[in-house]
Every structure is written in structure tokens, then in C-alpha cells.
């Protein structure tokens, strides 16, 4: 950047900034201005010249308003001598400010500006212009230099375009002496819980009673930090005493907009509607009021051996299966609760489901997408009860290929309420199983199910679907909801079998809708970026893995699978999987068909969980559109538009659910570990950063060993993901012994100190990169997280070598 002396953005002259009412022409005029500035013939000029050049003298007021709005949004800037330019054509750049607790931060450039820098733009604490973490800002580069890791750039924030932060949680404190000169009638302030918000929020009592000092509260910001580091705000919620589990839990729920009361935060009106639907039940064809009834046009499968298979505590049984041989091949039936029959499009219950997007599976409870009379009642495929379903009847050849799919509305009557642990025991022990009598009624179907599962799994491996080795915590609670133990969740053949069947059904449905040119909410997973794959290849190569299969331009799932397979053979699969996960794109919903990289499929969608995922409910409606075959071009176009909006909303809600689930899980982990202060544990280095190493314990609890607590001067190598002082090298996979120093309930963080390593002072030897043997515990008859396993995993295989998980 040529101009390194920029300290603040030149302003549009004051005489052009007087108040001007916004008119209907403003938005259109703004685009005209942008188009004019974008033209190749444009030479930067002052606003008055621009008015003249664009022949807008008669629209001066609208022009001024439009210019101010464009400047506020960071789309235009005023350069030297007040000349106007598009931000893209100026020395400035737009981006998101990411703050550090110490006051400095980085601007992450928008894609349009990212090519200007090798990385993010460093902003020192004195050059933040009062920006808060998450703000969209306008910045200028003021310095660049070369460091060991490449080009280092420093900049200054010149304008805050938009504040992301509007509310925060924190603890009520007295205003510190240094800030007492600030206007604060109450003498109280809130110190934010998150350290990246390194400012105070002054409270004005406004004539109302404020919570006592030490209260955990939610604050709505009225103003943002000034030069003294003080913002102002009003309290909107009081969670309780700061530092208590209840207060932290309440603040998490509030942060993510989760309402646990009244069966999941549903209004009385919605609950009444749900109960009426559930109580009405199925209307049969002998009803005088409803000729034909709910069964009209449905395939009657009530006489077939169909069964459900779920966790022992599951109540929302939304999928059932049956399998039988078909010559050399197979017929797989996947029967899903027909939620769309009861939840009509754009009804109040449907609008609520769309706004939620997904059920949220917290450690101690489930916040359902639909009221329980629907999810646990009329739409739950209870054994011995007629239930309306949408069925995918899939024909599979001897090689595991899908050669035909029938999608239909159906009615079933499940014969068995299967439980994973029981089914696994039955498959393993046969006639010696205590559950033999229950499952022997399946006859040959039990063996057929297992054989088909093994065929589909083998086909998945041949296709190159990624098999990542990660672990999931199972948090055991007592009757009062207190954590009593944390173990690694183990999966048996039943869980893996259902997973494969659901994956098969989802793939078949996506293919059918795509072939018929019917809209669909696809689940897509894009290829990782070349840069991320390069970094992964460097890491894997330094572990002694063969990375020659990774092409520079066209990375395939098969090439990555070869590396994962070799890593598993060398017992470093967990370490490699952790790094690979960070290199991959996030799976998301889209109305445009695109391959799923992790599953190595050309197309994929979510069909199997309409009770708890809105995209699945939308897909069911599109299936019915295809089955009925009566639709106009206009209806098809409207369906396509809704698919796009639904996908976008579902992506937002999925992220919200993931973050909420993770936050609550972290809280329970820290709460559990708080009983083990000063105790020592063996662990594995799970992440390496410039500020320390993260260590994961056998029970999946993770904490930080800060670099400040290590003996020696450690240097971080970003490319190799190592931290070294010249004698000792820490890298992912190292086994270490640590002592628990603190368990911070408020910030949900554990801190460790190093006690020693398995290889003395040096931990860089390759033999130390061993697969971590997690402690195994039987989960039989123990209460833990009630999530439904085959629908709450990621799209990519996860879990230990024998306990992989996947979102179906």
C-alpha cells in the first residue's frame, strides 16, 4: 500500500452532511453512484464534482443521503482532498475485527480484499478506534514487515461500519476508582464474562432497583466503549449469583435464545394445537365425516415385519426399517414419520419449526423443534400402533449399488421397539442373549440387516468416504442432574447399522428428487481449499505419512482416505483426524445440488429426521409434490425459492444449536472436573497454539497449559503446528502428564500445568505419536445424553476406530 501515513479517513465536507430525509429514491441512487464509481472511466473527484458529472443537481438532498449511507456501510471512502472512491479501489479494506483479551486484535479481510495481504491485519491496542470483537470495520495498512512465518502487516481502524455485539453477559461490580469520573449515577458496572470484551458497561439506575454486586446479568448496550474503556447499558435479565452453575447455564440459554420452560418454550396456543392434532390421531376410512380418511392413497405396510431401533431413553421414534433378500440383492425399507401430514405448510406450528430449525440436544435436556405431543406422540413410531409414514423402499444389488427407489406415502405398525444395547447383545450372543426372545421374532431379518449393513459399509469405504477418528463424551448425571462421570460414548453394530441405512435412504431420496427435477434442500460439503490441504499435507508428511496422493488442484475423498487409513495403521488416526477436521469445509444446506465431499457422493439430503430437523420436513413436502405430480411452473418456482430460504435459515439454526450444545457440555465438564483440583492426569496434546498447548484427558475433557507456565522460551511454528524451546517440542499427539490447576465455571475453561512427559524432556520422537487409548466403560443401564445418535453426528464419520459416528 502506497500511503502508509493514513491515520483516519478523510471526511465528506460538513456542508454535505446536514440531515436529509431518506426518500424512496435513495436505494436506487446509491446503486447508481456505485455503478458510476465502478466504471473504468471514473477518476476520483469531490462530491460536488460528482453531483455535476452525474447530472444530479436537482436531486442534491437524495444524493447527500445516499453518499452518507454508502460511507456508513463502508462501500465508499473519502480520500485525500475529499475525493470519493469505492473502498475496493482505495488504500482501505473492509473486514471483521477479532479482538484479543489484551487489547490488540486482527482484521480479517472480506474476500474482496483478502488478496492484498498474506493473512490478517494486526491492529495494536491504540489503533482499534474503540472497535469491539465482531465489528465490521474499515482499516488501513500502516506497516508491513517480513517475519519467520511470512509477511506481517499492521494497520489502523479508521471507521466502524457495524456493531455485531448488542448484548452481553457479565457480573455486577462497583465502578473502579479510575472510571468513577465517568457519568454513572448508580456507581455500578458490569464486567463482561468474555475476556475479549475488555471494557466495562456502566449502569444507570433509571430510578429502578439494580441487582446486588456479584449478580450474573445480561446487559443491552446503549453505547459502545469510549476512550476510557467504558460503555453504557441497561440490565435485561438477572441469572443469579455469578460463578454458580445455574447462573452460567441460564446465561447460555439466554445467549442462544433457548427457552426451556413450558415444554421447550412453546406458547400455550401452539401446545393446544399440538395436543389437538395428537389427540385426533389417525382418521380411518370408515369415518362418516372423512370419506377415504388419512389412509387413502397410502401403501399399507402394517402387515410387514418393521421395527424401530433407538437408544433406551429415546421417545421421538421417527424412523423404522425392514430388510429382506431380493435374489442376489436386497430390499431396504426406511419408513419415516409423516410429520408433514400433521404440520401444514405455513401453519403456526410450521412457522415455529422453521424459526427453530432443529431440536437442540443439551446435556440434561432436549429442546424440541416441535411440541412433544407431536414429536413424542402422534409422530412417534410406537410399537403396536398404526402410524403414518413416508417410505423409501430401496433396491440394492449384490455390490451395494442402489438400482431402484420407490418413494411413497405409507402406513406402518412397528412390531418391535428395538434398543441399541439389546440388539447389539442379541447379535453378539445369539441364543445366549437375554434378549433372544424379544428379537428372535425378526427371524432371518436380523442377519439380513447385518449383512446389508456390512455391504453398505464396504461400499462406503470403496467410494472413499472419510472415516475420521474422533470421540464424543457421554456425561452421566444423577437424579438431581449433577455430573457423576464422563466417559467416551461407545457405539455398537446396531448404531452403525442404522447409520448406514439412513445414509443410504438420504442418498436415494436426493437422487430421486434431482432426477425428477423437483426442488430439494440438499446437504452439501464443498472441497477444502488448496491452502488448507497444503497445510494438512505438510503436517501429515512430518508424521511420516505418504501424502503423494494429494493433488495440488484436485483433492479427492479417496486420496485423503488413503492417508487416514495409513494413519490408523500407525495408530495416529486420532491426531490426523483432528487436524483434517480443521482443514475441511463445514457441511451446509443449499437448494443447489452439489457433491458431498466427506461422504463422497454426488448428491445428498436429509430425509430421515423431520421431527427434529426442518430441512427433512421440507424434503418430505417435496417428495409429496413429486408423488402427486400435480403442480404448475409457478408452484415449482415458489418451492425452489422456499428451499433456498429454508436452507439459509437452517444453516443459521444448526450453528446456533451446535454452539449451545457445545457450551452446555463444556459447562458440565468443567463442573465435573472442579472436584479434581490438584490431581494429576495422563493426557494427549490435542491442539498447539502460540499461547500454549491444549491437553485432552481420557474422558474428553480438554484444558490449556499456558505457555507462560512452561519452563523456557517457546516458539510456535504455525506450519508444523509445534511449540518448541529448542530442547522440547510439543506437537499434536504427544502424551503428557498434567495437573489440574483451576476449573473456571464462568468461562467454562480448565487450566493445567505440566508434570512430565512419557519421553522425559524431549517429546518429539515419532514413537510418542501414538493413538490415545481412551478409557472404556460399559454404558449399559446408565443414563446419559438422550440425543439420537444416528441423527446428531456430523456428516463425516466420527468416533474411535470401532465407534465411528456420522450425521445421517
Q: What spans do the regions from the language model cover?
A:
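Residues that form ligand- and interface-recognition hot spots within folded domains
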Residues: 239, 313, 526, 742, ...
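Short, acidic/hydrophobic/Gly-rich beta-strand patch recurrent on exposed beta strands
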Residues: 106-110, 122, 189-194, 694-699, ...
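Short, charged, solvent-exposed linker or helix-capping segments at domain edges/interfaces
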Residues: 169, 245-250, 404-406, 752, ...
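A generic structural signal for residues embedded in beta-strands
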Residues: 139, 219, 688, 738-740
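Acidic, low-complexity intrinsically disordered tails
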Residues: 1-28, 714-720, 755-808
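Charge-lined substrate channels and their catalytic hotspots, especially those that engage the 3′ end
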Residues: 2-333, 340-386, 424-427, 671, ...
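Electropositive polyanion-binding surfaces
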Residues: 52, 206, 213, 218, ...
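Intrinsically disordered, low-complexity linker and terminal regions at domain boundaries
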Residues: 135, 706-755, 760, 765-780
Amino acid at each position: 500500500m502506497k500511503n502508509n501515513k493514513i491515520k483516519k479517513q478523510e471526511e465528506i465536507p460538513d456542508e454535505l452532511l446536514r440531515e436529509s430525509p431518506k426518500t424512496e429514491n435513495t436505494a436506487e441512487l446509491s446503486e447508481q453512484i456505485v455503478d458510476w464509481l465502478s466504471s473504468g472511466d471514473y477518476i476520483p473527484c469531490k462530491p460536488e464534482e460528482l453531483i455535476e458529472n452525474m447530472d444530479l443537481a436537482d436531486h442534491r438532498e437524495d444524493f447527500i443521503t445516499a453518499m452518507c449511507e454508502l460511507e456508513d456501510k463502508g462501500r465508499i471512502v473519502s480520500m485525500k482532498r475529499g475525493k470519493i472512491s469505492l473502498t475496493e479501489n482505495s488504500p482501505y479494506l473492509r473486514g471483521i475485527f477479532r479482538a484479543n483479551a489484551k487489547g490488540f486484535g486482527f482484521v480479517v479481510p472480506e474476500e474482496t480484499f483478502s488478496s492484498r495481504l498474506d493473512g490478517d491485519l494486526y491492529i495494536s491496542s491504540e489503533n482499534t478506534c474503540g472497535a469491539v470483537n465482531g465489528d465490521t470495520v474499515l482499516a488501513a495498512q500502516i506497516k508491513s514487515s517480513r517475519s519467520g512465518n511470512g509477511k506481517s502487516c499492521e494497520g489502523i481502524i479508521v471507521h466502524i461500519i457495524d456493531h455485531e455485539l448488542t448484548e452481553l453477559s457479565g457480573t455486577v461490580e462497583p465502578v473502579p476508582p479510575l472510571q468513577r469520573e465517568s457519568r454513572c449515577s448508580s456507581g455500578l458496572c458490569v464486567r463482561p464474562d468474555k475476556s475479549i470484551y475488555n471494557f466495562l458497561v456502566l449502569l444507570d439506575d433509571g430510578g429502578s432497583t439494580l441487582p446486588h454486586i456479584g449478580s450474573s446479568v445480561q446487559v443491552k448496550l446503549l453505547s459502545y466503549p469510549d476512550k476510557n474503556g467504558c460503555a453504557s447499558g441497561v440490565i435485561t435479565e438477572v441469572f443469579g449469583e455469578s460463578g454458580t452453575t445455574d447462573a452460567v447455564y441460564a446465561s447460555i440459554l439466554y445467549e442462544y435464545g433457548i427457552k426451556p420452560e413450558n415444554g421447550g418454550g412453546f406458547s400455550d396456543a401452539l401446545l393446544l394445537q399440538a395436543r389437538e392434532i395428537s389427540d385426533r390421531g389417525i382418521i380411518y376410512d370408515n369415518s362418516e365425516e372423512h370419506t377415504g380418511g388419512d389412509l387413502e392413497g397410502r401403501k399399507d405396510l402394517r402387515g410387514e415385519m418393521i421395527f424401530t431401533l433407538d437408544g433406551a431413553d429415546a421417545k421421538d421414534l421417527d424412523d423404522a426399517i425392514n430388510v429382506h433378500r431380493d435374489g442376489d440383492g436386497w430390499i431396504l425399507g426406511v419408513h419415516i414419520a409423516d410429520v408433514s401430514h400433521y404440520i401444514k405448510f405455513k401453519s403456526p406450528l410450521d412457522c415455529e419449526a422453521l424459526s427453530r430449525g432443529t431440536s437442540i440436544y443439551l446435556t440434561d435436556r432436549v429442546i424440541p423443534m416441535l411440541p412433544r405431543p407431536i414429536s413424542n406422540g402422534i409422530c412417534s413410531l410406537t410399537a403396536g400402533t398404526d402410524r403414518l409414514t413416508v417410505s423409501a423402499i430401496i433396491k440394492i444389488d449384490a455390490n451395494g449399488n442402489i438400482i431402484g427407489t420407490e418413494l411413497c406415502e405409507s402406513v406402518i405398525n412397528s412390531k418391535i421397539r428395538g434398543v441399541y444395547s439389546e440388539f447389539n447383545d442379541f447379535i453378539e450372543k445369539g441364543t445366549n442373549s437375554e434378549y433372544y426372545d424379544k428379537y428372535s421374532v425378526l427371524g432371518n431379518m436380523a442377519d439380513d440387516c447385518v449383512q446389508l449393513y456390512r455391504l453398505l459399509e464396504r461400499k462406503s469405504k470403496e467410494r472413499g468416504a472419510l472415516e475420521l477418528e474422533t470421540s464424543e463424551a457421554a456425561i452421566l448425571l444423577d437424579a438431581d442432574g449433577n455430573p457423576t462421570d464422563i466417559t467416551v460414548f461407545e457405539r455398537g453394530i446396531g448404531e452403525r447399522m442404522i447409520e448406514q441405512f439412513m445414509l443410504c435412504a438420504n442418498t436415494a431420496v436426493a437422487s430421486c428428487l434431482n432426477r425428477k427435477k423437483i426442488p430439494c434442500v440438499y446437504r452439501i460439503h464443498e472441497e477444502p481449499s488448496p491452502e488448507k490441504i497444503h497445510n494438512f499435507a505438510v503436517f501429515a508428511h512430518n508424521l511420516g505419512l505418504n501424502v503423494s496422493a494429494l493433488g495440488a488442484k484436485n483433492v479427492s475423498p479417496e486420496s485423503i482416505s488413503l492417508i487416514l487409513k495409513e494413519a490408523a495403521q500407525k495408530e495416529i488416526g486420532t491426531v490426523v483426524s483432528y487436524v483434517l477436521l480443521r482443514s475441511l469445509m463445514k457441511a451446509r444446506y443449499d437448494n443447489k445440488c452439489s457433491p458431498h465431499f466427506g461422504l463422497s457422493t454426488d448428491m445428498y439430503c436429509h430425509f430421515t429426521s423431520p421431527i427434529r430437523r426442518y430441512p427433512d420436513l421440507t424434503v418430505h413436502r417435496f417428495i409429496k409434490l413429486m408423488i402427486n405430480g400435480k403442480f404448475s411452473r409457478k408452484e415449482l418456482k415458489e418451492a425452489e425459492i422456499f428451499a433456498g430460504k429454508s436452507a439459509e435459515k437452517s444453516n443459521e439454526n444448526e450453528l446456533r444449536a451446535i454452539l449451545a450444545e457445545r457450551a452446555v457440555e463444556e459447562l458440565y465438564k468443567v463442573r465435573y472436573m472442579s472436584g479434581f483440583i490438584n490431581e494429576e492426569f495422563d493426557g494427549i496434546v490435542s491442539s498447539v497454539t502460540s499461547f500454549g498447548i491444549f491437553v485432552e484427558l481420557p474422558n474428553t475433557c480438554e484444558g490449556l497449559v499456558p505457555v507462560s507456565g512452561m519452563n523456557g522460551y517457546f516458539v510456535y511454528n504455525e506450519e508444523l503446528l509445534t511449540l518448541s524451546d529448542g530442547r522440547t517440542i510439543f506437537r499434536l499427539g504427544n502424551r503428557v502428564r498434567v495437573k489440574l490447576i483451576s476449573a473456571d465455571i464462568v468461562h467454562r475453561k480448565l487450566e493445567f500445568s505440566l508434570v512430565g512427559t512419557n519421553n522425559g524432556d524431549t517429546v518429539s520422537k515419532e514413537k510418542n505419536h501414538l493413538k490415545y487409548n481412551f478409557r472404556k466403560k460399559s454404558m449399559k443401564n446408565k443414563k446419559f445424553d438422550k440425543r439420537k445418535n444416528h441423527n446428531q453426528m456430523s456428516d463425516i464419520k466420527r468416533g474411535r476406530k470401532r465407534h465411528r459416528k456420522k450425521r445421517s
